[in-house]
């Protein structure tokens, strides 16, 4: 028997450990990629839902104001979801963040010099804080019937 051929018979323990380590690393990388993909997909879905919801909220505000719901020198609570008839989707919270008033030359938070224009910032955010979308609306005081604005 040739002693050289005995050493080349099969895998050694070291070769098996290296192969196992390489395969383990590959599995960890693949699983990590899948987990990251699922997390990114979840955030994107929540952003899309929040974006659609904040636009619905903005439409409710516009309808509310058009129906003479405009409040001079309003606080954000005047345009809260409950005040304008908006219900946020399950797992989301809607808020009226800020109202600023047009002074004739600039937007200001106070003192109130409301000349019929308000800038309202509204937000819809997921309750797990992964996604939030904001919209800034400019509200104009509607003219009454027969009025020349």
Residue spans of the language-model regions?
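Alpha-helix initiation/capping motif
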Residues: 6, 39, 43, 111-113
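N-terminal segment of the canonical double-stranded RNA-binding domain
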Residues: 9-13, 92-93
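Aliphatic-rich helix starts adjacent to a transmembrane/signal segment
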Residues: 11-55
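N-terminal leader/signal peptides at the extreme start of proteins
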Residues: 1-11
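Low-complexity, Gly/Pro-rich coil/beta segments used as flexible assembly/activation regions
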Residues: 45-149
